[in-house]
């Protein structure tokens, strides 16, 4: 059952926020590298914005998968001109095994939804099944190293609320322009590391999120990057 109660069009609009462009998008594409000629799985594709950008940057084929039906419907509406190179599928990622024929996976917030090691491992196994040997997964996720009690970050278009680091406890994002909150779940870093290992990935590392160089020196970002940012990247190799 989906934990997603927010509207697809509202969420798509949030992709215009500065942190989503200059931190989220920049980090994902910088870690992915040149996608020219690559076959890519866009896990948790939402309205397909990164699927289309992957093709624009040279990817030969992209599969976009999302568990929310209205997101996939919106992605298909925006897919004009991309039909031959992007396939959108309505499925939860853990229920969508692959054939080991893709070069890369990008997973935007997908791994913020499991509530346990077992669930996280199922997500990771499904994504691993799409990758060739030597294939790469880039994740962008709620940061499990950031633990606090209260609310923070209202000045970046969202408020993040959490209360301690109990495994499976909710992490709530209230995003400007969205009627309903985004509810993620906290897992310990070691839980994620074990899930990737049990899913068959040969390498895994955490990566601090990156800031687009054209924003360097902009004091707007000082609070975002103080201590542990609210988000973190993951890099795994099969």
At which residue positions do the language-model features occur?
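A short glycine-rich, Lys/Arg-flanked "PGG" loop and its adjoining helix->strand segment in the class I
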Residues: 121-133
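Residues lining the SAM
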Residues: 108-111, 140
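Conserved class I S-adenosyl-L-methionine
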Residues: 1-35, 38-44, 49, 53
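SAM-dependent methyltransferase
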Residues: 138-197
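Class I SAM-dependent methyltransferase SAM/SAH-binding core
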Residues: 47-95
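A short acidic, Gly/Pro-enriched loop at the edge of an enzyme's catalytic core
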Residues: 96-105
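C-terminal lobe and adjacent flexible extensions of AdoMet/dcAdoMet transferase-like proteins
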Residues: 199-238
């Amino acid at each position: 059952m989906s934990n997603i109660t927010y509207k697809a069009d509202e969420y798509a609009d949030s992709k215009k926020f500065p942190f989503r462009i200059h931190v989220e998008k920049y980090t994902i594409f910088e870690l992915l590298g040149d996608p020219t000629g690559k076959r890519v799985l866009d896990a948790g594709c939402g309205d397909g914005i990164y699927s289309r950008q992957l093709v624009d940057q040279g990817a030969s084929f992209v599969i976009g998968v999302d568990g929310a039906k209205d997101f996939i419907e919106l992605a298909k509406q925006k897919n004009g001109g991309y039909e031959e190179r992007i396939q959108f599928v309505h499925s939860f990622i853990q229920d969508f095994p692959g054939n080991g024929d893709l070069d890369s996976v990008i997973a935007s917030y997908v791994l913020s939804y499991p509530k346990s090691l077992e669930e996280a491992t199922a997500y990771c196994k499904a994504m691993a099944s799409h990758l060739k040997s030597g294939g790469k997964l880039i994740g962008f996720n709620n940061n499990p190293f950031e633990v606090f009690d209260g609310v923070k970050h209202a000045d970046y278009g969202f408020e993040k609320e959490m209360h301690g680091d109990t495994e499976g406890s909710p992490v709530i994002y209230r995003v400007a322009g969205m009627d309903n909150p985004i509810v993620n779940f906290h897992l310990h870093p070691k839980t994620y590391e074990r899930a990737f290992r049990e899913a068959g990935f040969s390498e895994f590392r955490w990566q601090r999120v990156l800031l687009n160089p054209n924003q360097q020196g902009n004091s707007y970002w000082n609070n975002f990057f103080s201590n542990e940012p609210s988000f973190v990247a993951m890099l795994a190799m099969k």
